[in-house]
């Protein structure tokens, strides 16, 4: 099934609150579907109050991009997610994964248990199960799962509404295409693409600017890059849906104004 395009924006708080709220209002006016925030303790405000404020400001869909399962008990993640679904009247989507590379050191620093990769994945399963129990029969909070390995992909096929791949900068188009086709062969889920680089710009909290080389990524034909030219971006996005199945594209807020013509052209199509 060909899904209509939608576009999300990762909008960390990097300025004073007035400027951040003004940016959110522009994002809404441009027609983006979803405001997203990262889960990075101390570097950013906590996701739940940030998203509640974003919803109150714009009325848009909001979501986490993405909860790191080891940072809190599964029931706590589920309770927070369910609460956001209730308070936004069903306009929240829970993005969740097992945590960014190097999260083990962060867990030790915070006195939290350091579980194995399999244990962290089980934490994702437990959080989704608890969320479904809290939602009950009358509410369904969409789950976006960030995956890479075969076990994570298998779990996503069981529990996720949307799948995004935790790709490396060196991953080629062909490598990601194979992962995507493997998932779609098993189940018709929505595919979301994390795009931290537009042109030569790197979005904060989507990739490390110090470790990201846009030119090298273009040379590798990475799907984590989009052209800065809106016309070229439209063509490339359409190609990625036709050839791979991507319909949900997530970019950084720094590029929201630049990519506004793309959203106007493709959103809902």
Where are the predicted features?
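Active-site-adjacent structural elements that line small-molecule/cofactor binding pockets in enzymes
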Residues: 1-269
């Amino acid at each position: 099934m060909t899904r209509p395009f939608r576009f999300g924006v990762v909008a960390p708080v990097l300025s004073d609150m007035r400027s951040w709220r003004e940016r959110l209002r522009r994002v809404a006016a441009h027609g983006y579907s979803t405001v997203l925030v990262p889960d990075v303790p101390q570097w950013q405000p906590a996701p739940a109050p940030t998203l509640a404020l974003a919803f109150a400001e714009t009325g848009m869909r909001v979501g986490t991009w993405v909860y790191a399962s080891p940072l809190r008990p599964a029931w706590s993640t589920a309770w927070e997610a369910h609460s956001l679904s209730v308070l936004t009247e069903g306009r929240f989507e829970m993005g969740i994964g097992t945590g960014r590379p190097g999260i083990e050191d962060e867990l030790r620093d915070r006195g939290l248990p350091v579980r194995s990769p399999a244990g962290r994945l089980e934490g994702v399963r437990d959080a989704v199960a608890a969320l479904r129990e809290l939602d009950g029969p009358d509410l369904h909070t969409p789950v976006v799962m960030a995956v890479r390995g075969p076990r994570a992909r298998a779990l996503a096929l069981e529990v996720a509404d949307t799948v995004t791949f935790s790709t490396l900068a060196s991953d080629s188009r062909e490598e990601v295409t194979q992962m995507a086709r493997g998932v779609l062969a098993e189940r018709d889920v929505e595919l979301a693409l994390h795009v931290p680089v537009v042109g030569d710009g790197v979005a904060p909290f989507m990739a490390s600017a110090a470790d990201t080389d846009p030119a090298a990524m273009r040379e590798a034909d990475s799907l984590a890059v989009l052209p800065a030219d809106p016309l070229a971006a439209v063509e490339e996005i359409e190609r990625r849906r036709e050839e791979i199945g991507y319909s949900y594209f997530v970019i950084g807020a720094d590029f929201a104004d630049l990519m506004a013509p793309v959203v106007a052209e493709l959103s809902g199509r």
